[in-house]
C-alpha cells in the first residue's frame, strides 16, 4: 500500500526493521541518502528552525529580514531561526533570531495543509541577519540565496542541503549535502502514479531506479542550482513517498519560480504593516 508523507525534521537513513513503523501518513524523518558532509561556507543561506532544543525544519535566507520555507513547517507560534550553523558542536558563528508569533509568518493562502500544492511560507525576522559577517576563517557565515530570475533553467543538476540522522540513527555534527537530478512537472508526473497530488507548481528530484532520488532533505530546506550568476533556490523540500528506504519514486519540491510574484507581493504587503 502506498502512503504519502510530508518530509520532516531531519536527514536520516532507516533500517529495514523500522519500515513497518513509519509506513503510514504523517511526518517521518526526511533524509539525505548517499549524501556527504558539506564544506564549511558552502551553503551560508541555509537556516535551522528549532522549537525547544530540536531542529524541525530547514529554510533559506532570501533577504536580510526574510526566510523562505515550506508552508507545512509553520506549525509553531514561537521558535528560533539559527543561521550560520555548520557543525552542531560549534555555534560560535551563528546568528539566532526569535519568532514570537504567527504575525511573523505567512503561509500561502491556497495551501490546504498536509501533502499538496502551494506548500510555501515566509518568515519575517525583526532583527535583520548580518549578511556581511565573516567567520573566524574568513568564510561567509550568513548570506542570502538568489531567487530564480528566469535566465536559467530550473531543471538539471542540483544540490540539496540539510541536517538530521545518519545511517546509524545518530545526529551528524556537520551539514550534509547531496547532488541530485532535477526534473520538471511533466516528467515527474509520468514517474509518479496518476492519483498523486502533483501540481504544475511542483518540481522533483529523480534518478530512475535509484533510492538516492527519493525522500531527500529537511522539510522546507533548499534545493539549489549553481549558475554563472550565483546559487539559485529552485525548490523547497515538500513531500515524498514513504517508507523512504524502499522507494525509488521522485522527491517532490515546491517550485519557487511559480511563486515569484507571491513572494514579492507578500513582502511588499507586510512592509506596509510595519
From Swiss-Prot:
InterPro entries: Peptidase_S1, Peptidase_S1_PA, Peptidase_S1_PA_chymotrypsin, Peptidase_S1A, Trypsin_dom, TRYPSIN_HIS, TRYPSIN_SER. SUPFAM superfamilies: Trypsin-like serine proteases (SSF50494). Keywords: Disulfide bond, Hydrolase, Protease, Secreted, Serine protease, Signal. Pfam families: Trypsin (PF00089). Residues 32-268 form the Peptidase S1 domain. It comes from the Eukaryota. Transmembrane segments: none annotated. The active site is at residues 72, 119, 219. Residues 1-16 form the signal peptide. Induction: By blood meal. Its EC number is 3.4.21.-. Expressed in the midgut. Disulfide bonds join 57-73, 188-204, 215-244. It is found in: Secreted. GO terms for molecular function: serine-type endopeptidase activity. GO terms for biological process: proteolysis. The keyword Isomerase does not apply. One of its GO terms (cellular component) is extracellular region. Belongs to the peptidase S1 family. PANTHER family: PEPTIDASE S1 DOMAIN-CONTAINING PROTEIN, POLYSERASE-RELATED. Protein with lectin and protease activity involved in the establishment of trypanosome infections in tsetse flies. Binds D-glucosamine and agglutinates bloodstream-form trypanosomes and rabbit red blood cells. Capable of inducing transformation of bloodstream-form trypanosomes into procyclic (midgut) forms in vitro. This is Lectizyme. It comes from Glossina fuscipes fuscipes (Riverine tsetse fly).
